[in-house]
Amino acid sequence: MQIYMVGGAVRDRLLGRPVNDHDWVVVGATPDDMVARGYLPVGRDFPVFLHPETREEYALARTERKSGRGYRGFVVQTSPDVTLEEDLSRRDLTINAIAASAAWTGAEDLFDPYGGARDLQARVLRHVTDSFREDPVRILRVARFAARFTDFTVAPETMQLMREMVHDGEADHLVPERVWQELARGLMEPQPSRMFDVLRDCGALAVVLPEVERLWGVPQRPEYHPEVDTGVHLMMVLDMAAHLQAPLTVRFACLTHDLGKGTTPHDVLPRHIGHEQRSARLLKAVCERLRVPVECRELADVVAREHGNIHRSGDLGAAALVRLLERCDAIRKPARLDEILLACECDARGRLGFADRPYPQRARINAALAAVQSVTTSSVAAHAAQLGLSGPKVGEMIHAARVQAVADWLHATAQPAPEPQGNAG
């Protein structure tokens, strides 16, 4: 029985990156051998075991054979006769198909039959064998790795293979859970725009997210968007979200906030009147199709509907500011307002020449919320009761008190309006 470190741990160590998790493959063993040594079986689809002390995963060497279309169409075989090279051959990229002995101290302890170390040095993402085409999820993984390893390029032959897979309909069989899983992970990488560049290049974006794909080539008003192209703007917004270390909820909202611009009638371009509501409708369809988590879809919905109003909030008076806060549910969920405003800031700064501009709308709306929060609703309700009011009338009094609090703040501070963002959205 031989044990080897494999996958991302070897790759990242060779790149000089931090290694947080280790994956191990075991050659020449049976499940009974592993159990006899105290390993805990946890694998459902193939034999995977937890180390009795470190709790790291140890998988028996295995081969995979295509038996149908899509992600689940595989027959897995494990046997003590499966070699290390056979196990590595089923992996997606050469940089992930390097193994090292458990006592790894130098290059002599590496087993690299597919040239992964060479591709690491050359900064190339290259598929291991033609069996890459058997799993369409690998298209998404390559795109995600491009967003992580920002100085790597996809090998021409690998890009061609991915194009063939899309053309042959393999991407049509991606299951929603895996699409969302890879999309979410890719959005959290250092340069998420590169994921979408790769997906566009191979044709997969039109399959998994046609609502995003159609944004390229759609013009915007150059006085507000010097980059003009909506797809280019979207990628700049995503990379700004990564630069500001935004959480997944914000990054997904950034991805989907302008979907409606892809359905703007041609005769009104480059204006996009009403695109916010169209974006919200398209967002709903995307979330249902990909089974997007509730917290992501809820934030994205508010951002899609309200980002234009937030950009123009410098023109709003007290009553309109309070209504905006109410539509954002900011009074009940002030922490979520921070994420809404962060997404809007990414949108405003994700334009050519705007990356270093301030976004004063954020401070203005937060200050308006603070004024609203200064109203003690219980006191207002008690006063309403003294006046013999109840039901909706109490709510109206609370709303009026909040508007007055914001009006007083605006008057006391003589707040100047932020620079108009126009159609920054």
From Swiss-Prot:
<comment type="subunit">
    <text>Monomer. Can also form homodimers and oligomers.</text>
</comment>
<dbReference type="InterPro" id="IPR032828">
    <property type="entry name" value="PolyA_RNA-bd"/>
</dbReference>
<dbReference type="InterPro" id="IPR050124">
    <property type="entry name" value="tRNA_CCA-adding_enzyme"/>
</dbReference>
<feature type="binding site">
    <location>
        <position position="91"/>
    </location>
    <ligand>
        <name>CTP</name>
    </ligand>
</feature>
<dbReference type="GO" id="GO:0000049">
    <property type="term" value="F:tRNA binding"/>
</dbReference>
<feature type="binding site">
    <location>
        <position position="144"/>
    </location>
    <ligand>
        <name>ATP</name>
    </ligand>
</feature>
<dbReference type="InterPro" id="IPR012006">
    <property type="entry name" value="CCA_bact"/>
</dbReference>
<comment type="function">
    <text>Catalyzes the addition and repair of the essential 3'-terminal CCA sequence in tRNAs without using a nucleic acid template. Adds these three nucleotides in the order of C, C, and A to the tRNA nucleotide-73, using CTP and ATP as substrates and producing inorganic pyrophosphate. tRNA 3'-terminal CCA addition is required both for tRNA processing and repair. Also involved in tRNA surveillance by mediating tandem CCA addition to generate a CCACCA at the 3' terminus of unstable tRNAs. While stable tRNAs receive only 3'-terminal CCA, unstable tRNAs are marked with CCACCA and rapidly degraded.</text>
</comment>
<keyword id="KW-0460">Magnesium</keyword>
<feature type="binding site">
    <location>
        <position position="21"/>
    </location>
    <ligand>
        <name>Mg(2+)</name>
    </ligand>
</feature>
<keyword id="KW-0067">ATP-binding</keyword>
<feature type="binding site">
    <location>
        <position position="141"/>
    </location>
    <ligand>
        <name>ATP</name>
    </ligand>
</feature>
<dbReference type="GO" id="GO:0001680">
    <property type="term" value="P:tRNA 3'-terminal CCA addition"/>
</dbReference>
<dbReference type="GO" id="GO:0016791">
    <property type="term" value="F:phosphatase activity"/>
</dbReference>
<feature type="binding site">
    <location>
        <position position="11"/>
    </location>
    <ligand>
        <name>ATP</name>
    </ligand>
</feature>
<feature type="domain" description="HD">
    <location>
        <begin position="230"/>
        <end position="331"/>
    </location>
</feature>
<feature type="binding site">
    <location>
        <position position="141"/>
    </location>
    <ligand>
        <name>CTP</name>
    </ligand>
</feature>
<feature type="binding site">
    <location>
        <position position="8"/>
    </location>
    <ligand>
        <name>CTP</name>
    </ligand>
</feature>
<dbReference type="Pfam" id="PF01966">
    <property type="entry name" value="HD"/>
</dbReference>
<dbReference type="InterPro" id="IPR006674">
    <property type="entry name" value="HD_domain"/>
</dbReference>
<dbReference type="GO" id="GO:0005524">
    <property type="term" value="F:ATP binding"/>
</dbReference>
<keyword id="KW-0548">Nucleotidyltransferase</keyword>
<dbReference type="InterPro" id="IPR043519">
    <property type="entry name" value="NT_sf"/>
</dbReference>
<dbReference type="GO" id="GO:0000287">
    <property type="term" value="F:magnesium ion binding"/>
</dbReference>
<dbReference type="GO" id="GO:0004810">
    <property type="term" value="F:CCA tRNA nucleotidyltransferase activity"/>
</dbReference>
<comment type="similarity">
    <text>Belongs to the tRNA nucleotidyltransferase/poly(A) polymerase family. Bacterial CCA-adding enzyme type 1 subfamily.</text>
</comment>
<keyword id="KW-0511">Multifunctional enzyme</keyword>
<keyword id="KW-0547">Nucleotide-binding</keyword>
<keyword id="KW-0694">RNA-binding</keyword>
<keyword id="KW-0819">tRNA processing</keyword>
<dbReference type="Pfam" id="PF01743">
    <property type="entry name" value="PolyA_pol"/>
</dbReference>
<feature type="binding site">
    <location>
        <position position="8"/>
    </location>
    <ligand>
        <name>ATP</name>
    </ligand>
</feature>
<dbReference type="Pfam" id="PF12627">
    <property type="entry name" value="PolyA_pol_RNAbd"/>
</dbReference>
<keyword id="KW-0378">Hydrolase</keyword>
<dbReference type="GO" id="GO:0004112">
    <property type="term" value="F:cyclic-nucleotide phosphodiesterase activity"/>
</dbReference>
<keyword id="KW-0533">Nickel</keyword>
<dbReference type="InterPro" id="IPR003607">
    <property type="entry name" value="HD/PDEase_dom"/>
</dbReference>
<keyword id="KW-0808">Transferase</keyword>
<protein>
    <recommendedName>
        <fullName>Multifunctional CCA protein</fullName>
        <ecNumber>2.7.7.72</ecNumber>
        <ecNumber>3.1.3.-</ecNumber>
        <ecNumber>3.1.4.-</ecNumber>
    </recommendedName>
</protein>
<feature type="binding site">
    <location>
        <position position="91"/>
    </location>
    <ligand>
        <name>ATP</name>
    </ligand>
</feature>
<feature type="binding site">
    <location>
        <position position="144"/>
    </location>
    <ligand>
        <name>CTP</name>
    </ligand>
</feature>
<dbReference type="GO" id="GO:0042245">
    <property type="term" value="P:RNA repair"/>
</dbReference>
